[in-house]
UniProtKB/Swiss-Prot annotation:
Name of the gene: rnz
Residue pairs linked by disulfide bridges in the UniProt entry: none
Taxonomic source organism: Listeria monocytogenes serotype 4a (strain HCC23)
Amino acids binding Zn(2+) 1: H63, H65, H140, D211
Protein role: Zinc phosphodiesterase, which displays some tRNA 3'-processing endonuclease activity. Probably involved in tRNA maturation, by removing a 3'-trailer from precursor tRNA.
Reactions catalysed, as given in the entry: Endonucleolytic cleavage of RNA, removing extra 3' nucleotides from tRNA precursor, generating 3' termini of tRNAs. A 3'-hydroxy group is left at the tRNA terminus and a 5'-phosphoryl group is left at the trailer molecule
Pfam families assigned: Lactamase_B
Protein name stated in the entry: Ribonuclease Z
CDD domains: RNaseZ_ZiPD-like_MBL-fold
Domain of life: Bacteria
Length: 306
């Protein structure tokens, strides 16, 4: 899995940063892409990346401010033009259905695939054999959500070397042992498959937040995450200003990461007042509180767990 930051700016596009969109690429895990927010010109950013719209399975919208949704109609239309036929699910606050359907209707856009809308409330919004996703409200004036994506633990690998050392020849019997079954060998000896399976591989946790000021609900969403993606619209000494505009500072994001025991913090949603050099200072500031912090730039790619 990896996170691809398609847009990392706040409010409006700038020369260095487009508005918000983040892709969670899971090609190895489920041959799919999940998209978090879709600001204006997201599809242009996708063309500059390795992402294929044909792999897009789900879109998650954090809130309905324009810099997070104005790219949706064009992206949905382009997916259709490119031959997309598989269903696409869009999750988001109440109003996302009306916004998308109205945009498509007024523009006379007809899609070649079905959109399934899921207007979310706090709690579990998705679960299958591989992942679960829970959401909770943040504090941004307009209803804004944070997403917690939990990968389920993977079964432990079969320790084939140990089996061979114990005299078990490779063959169909390995499949039964891999399932943890008890099997009887040709010589009459009995082995327990569970003795030859490594410990389950812990699934990853990714927390991706929409715009917010510092608020209590963030902690549970971020707790023990492998990666926390958090806005940092302002520098640390602008806490009062950030609060007035319902946003966060670098230091607030870093403090949350430390308190929540996350492994890596990635800062995004950077105000256009900060150029690339100033952004480096934002990073240094956050790292003074939480060392394993990165600052995202457009088209940056972050492998999960590294």
């Amino acid at each position: 899995m990896e996170l691809v930051f398609l847009g990392t700016g706040a409010g409006v596009p700038s020369r260095g940063r487009n508005v918000t969109s983040i892709a969670l690429s899971m090609l190895n895990e489920r041959n799919a892409i999940w998209l978090f927010d879709c600001g204006e010109a997201t599809q242009h950013q996708i063309m500059r990346s390795q992402i294929k719209l044909s792999k897009l399975e789900k879109i998650f919208i954090t809130h309905l401010h324009g810099d997070h949704i104005f790219g949706l109609p064009g992206l949905l239309s382009s997916r259709s033009f490119q031959g997309g036929e598989s269903d696409l699910t869009i999750y988001g606050p109440v109003g996302i259905t009306e916004y998308v359907e109205t945009s498509l209707r007024l523009s006379g856009t007809r899609l070649t695939y079905k959109i399934i809308f899921n207007e979310i409330e706090p709690g579990l919004i998705f679960e299958d054999k591989m992942f679960s996703i829970t959401v909770d409200e943040l504090d941004h004036g307009l209803r804004s959500f944070g997403y917690r994506i939990v990968e389920k633990d993977k079964p432990g690998a079969l320790n084939a070397d140990k089996l061979i050392e114990d005299g078990v020849e490779p063959g169909p019997i390995f499949q039964k042992i891999k399932k943890g079954e008890t099997v009887t060998l040709a010589d009459g000896s009995v082995i327990n498959g569970k003795d030859y399976i490594d410990e389950p591989q812990k699934g990853k946790i990714i927390s991706i937040f929409g715009d917010t000021k510092a608020t209590a609900s963030e902690l549970e969403l971020a707790l023990n995450a492998d990666v926390l993606v958090h806005e940092a619209t302002f520098e640390g000494d602008k806490e009062k200003l950030a609060g007035e505009y319902m946003h966060s500072t670098t230091l607030q994001a870093a403090s949350l990461a430390k308190k929540a025991n996350v492994k890596k913090l990635i800062l995004t949603h950077i105000s256009s007042r900060y150029d690339r050099d100033a952004s480096k200072e934002l990073l240094i500031e956050a790292q003074s509180v939480f060392e394993n912090t990165e600052i995202a730039y457009d088209l940056a790619v972050f492998p999960i767990g590294e």
